[in-house]
Amino acid sequence: DANGVADWKQGRKTTEVGRVLEMVSEGKVNQFAFVIDGTWRYFKDGELSFSYTWNDTKDNTSYNGNVANSATLSQMVVDDPRDLSKMSYSNNQFRHKVVVYGSAPTFWGISVGARFSGIGGTRYSLIVGGNVNGDFVDSNDLAYIYDPNDPKTPEYLRNGINDILNNPDVEESTKDYIRKSFGKVAERNGGVNGFYGTLDLRIAKKFKIYKQQNLELSVDIFNVANLLNKNWGAGHNLGAQKIYSIKGFDQDKKEYIYNVNANTGVSSLNGTPYQFQIGLRYAF
């Protein structure tokens, strides 16, 4: 209608049947991973461990279920949510994962250890806030990215997209994703998040009490970088980005009228802020 609200009931093949379920096995996933890890022990109880994973995961649906209407809630689509013919990067995709753990040799009963873990290359999509394809779901439609350099692009859309591209707070990955999508529907999970990680530190001191009895005092600091600077140790990972919301529908031109979200690609930062944990253990 004029407000851009699609009547999903008009998409039915027949009005004679209320609901029909056809069970099919069309889900596909291609996953490749390379893992390298190792451990080096030195000077009595010193240790350094390292693990790196390179991963590539593509599928035609990341939803592990069997009801089409439920699957569309998380499956970003171009048009028909039942069309699983195209493989693209999975919701579960990541490119790099690194875990490093090290502990210094114990001196005078004092032990110090640190752990770094990070992940990069997770994915997200550019979508429309609204039920574009009339499938009953208003949060699963991939957005058509208008080319601001195309003279046929309406001025308000040209200005809106350029505002996003010129916004210094927008993640570079979003700008790249938008530019690669000019003049076409954005690819599912075509946005690539950067690499982010956290560093944890542990310091412990053991006091000998009597014979085999001892008392250990420990301090754990989680996300040390965030303790030093509130802007460090925070992730900039993005989820699905609603670049447009439906404002209305032009009956003459047969096209939607959108509001452009100027904050598309602006990360609210994520992760866990720094934390302290103090422990006391008595062993006998």
Describe the predicted segments one by one:
Residues 24-31, 88-95, 185-197, 266-274:
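Aromatic-acidic/polar surface patches that form glycan- and anion
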